[in-house]
């Protein structure tokens, strides 16, 4: 009886499928990383078993790829002990097809590597002079502020034109916003007509320096703005009838300082290191003592546990014309504790 012959076509088909499988495996083998470090190694693993084409299809400038198909233990050793994966291949060698996002452009650096740098569109800016930013800093122009926003402060905006001021005099706020001065004697533009949502938790309650309990930070801001003078935050939670600072629990590393003038406590940030700068201006405090700076005054208050506030700039024994101007502004009761409200 004749034996059945093996068809050579079937064997060829099997070999072809095997080669295709191996080719697919080699194309898929590899690891995708989110960045290439300065040491040349890949760091921050994004996904395993990706081909270079799949890994680099995102268009991210920092994405890199390694072709080694290794086990989890090796990956762990690379990331923890070796500073990243070796043989790191960056997806982008040039700026071609690189998407840096709004306000940024791709440029080749000194090492001939593509990098995304801040390059905001300043062509439509009409005011070329100084501007005061929401961070209380003066910028040489709006374009410089936009660059600062791009680098590290995404919420940064222009408050008003001109340098940042210590009074509301000559400050022109845009739109319906109003100029007020916070507890650090910096002028800000704020809007009062904000609708505050109802509080969803009792933890949102705040006690104001006026002894009134406010449902939320939004309600305290709005009340301050409508009142046109400083209220300020005493402490978190509902107001209590405290006899001393022992009855008040401060959070967030704050310390209770007692205000003998009104018989209430106030939680304040302490432990701030005062800079050794000769440019700091002395201040006259509410205890009629002169301190080298506002920071030195706060330091003394934290040390004694008694609240101190700035009466005016300069020595208590000499009131300058500028101080009289400031007192004139204080009579208008422009003071808004933005810094004390927004810090939490």
Curated annotation (Swiss-Prot):
Main location: secreted
Gene Ontology BP annotations: cell differentiation
Source organism superkingdom: Eukaryota
InterPro entries given in the database record: Fol_N (IPR003645), Follistatin/Osteonectin_EGF (IPR015369), Kazal_dom (IPR002350), Kazal_dom_sf (IPR036058), Prot_Inhib_GrowthFact_Antg (IPR050653), TB_dom (IPR017878), TB_dom_sf (IPR036773)
Chain's gene name: FST
Residue segments, region Disordered: 316-344
CDD domains linked to this entry: KAZAL_FS
Pfam family membership, one: FST_N
Amino acid composition bias (Acidic residues), ranges on this chain: 321-333
Positions glycosylated per UniProt: 124, 288
Signal sequence bounds: 1-29
Repeat recorded as keyword: yes
The name this protein goes by in its record: Follistatin
UniProt keyword list: Disulfide bond, Glycoprotein, Repeat, Secreted, Signal
Domain Kazal-like: 112-166, 186-241, 261-318
SMART domains registered for this protein in UniProt: FOLN, KAZAL
Known function: Binds directly to activin and functions as an activin antagonist. Specific inhibitor of the biosynthesis and secretion of pituitary follicle stimulating hormone (FSH).
Compartments reported by the entry: Secreted
Cystine pairings recorded for this chain: 32-55, 42-88, 56-91, 95-106, 100-116, 118-150, 122-143, 132-164, 168-179, 173-189, 192-225, 196-218, 207-239, 245-256, 250-267, 270-302, 274-295, 284-316
GO CC entries: extracellular region
Domain Follistatin-like: start-end pairs: 94-117, 167-190, 244-268
Quaternary data: Monomer.
Domain TB as annotated: residue spans: 30-103
